Amino acid sequence: MKFVVFASLLASAARFAPAQQSARTSVATNMAFENELGAQPPLGFFDPLGLVADGDQEKFDRLRYVEIKHGRISMLAVAGYLVQENGIRLPGDIDYSGTSFESIPNGFAALTTISGAGIAQIVAFIGFLELAVMKDITGGEFVGDFRNDFIDFGWDSFDEETKMQKRAIELNQGRAAQMGILALMVHEQLGVSLIPN
């Protein structure tokens, strides 16, 4: 019996030894992005799946672009969810048959109320935005800079430190909004509202 216990302890110790070695290797290869924007306390640079373990800057920039875009969309989604939960709706009808915006329920239930053609229009519009509008056509100042020499809102009047601070704030708020909209959707499916009545 003692042999079985000893053998199981030895096997479990051997099982975890390579994982520690792998973690050291992963940290060493990710040092290239340790000082990038978004590598902030308490986590620092966080890449648990090793997506940029090879140190590829182009791949990192693409993932950062996607993170910023999804963060911006999630911020709009959280704001839209809160607006709808407070009973604020667009005036008029969503289709020619007289279905008013007021009659459409919030959240996932809206998908069963809107016609297939309406959902197809929404998907087509999002596809149009993705392929034609939401593009960085000028090679902006940073990844995710969609000003395209058209919209500025005073961005160029800030010093470099303020710009970095504002970009870090946007990145963190986008990350929080992604978790926030996910939490709202999960709680909706669980039948629990996070919004006080």
Curated annotation (Swiss-Prot):
Location in the cell: Plastid, Chloroplast thylakoid membrane
InterPro entries named in the record: Chloro_AB-bd_pln, Chloroa_b-bind
GO molecular function: chlorophyll binding
GO annotation, cellular component aspect: chloroplast thylakoid membrane; light-harvesting complex; photosystem II
Transit peptide location on this chain: 1-31
TM region positions: 73-94, 114-134, 174-196
Keywords: Chlorophyll, Chloroplast, Chromophore, Light-harvesting polypeptide, Membrane, Photosynthesis, Photosystem II, Plastid, Thylakoid, Transit peptide, Transmembrane, Transmembrane helix
Family: Belongs to the fucoxanthin chlorophyll protein family.
Biological function: The light-harvesting complex (LHC) functions as a light receptor, it captures and delivers excitation energy to photosystems with which it is closely associated. Energy is transferred from the carotenoid and chlorophyll C (or B) to chlorophyll A and the photosynthetic reaction centers where it is used to synthesize ATP and reducing power.
Protein name (database record): Fucoxanthin-chlorophyll a-c binding protein E, chloroplastic
Organism: Phaeodactylum tricornutum (Diatom)
Lineage of producing organism: Eukaryota, Sar, Stramenopiles, Ochrophyta, Bacillariophyta
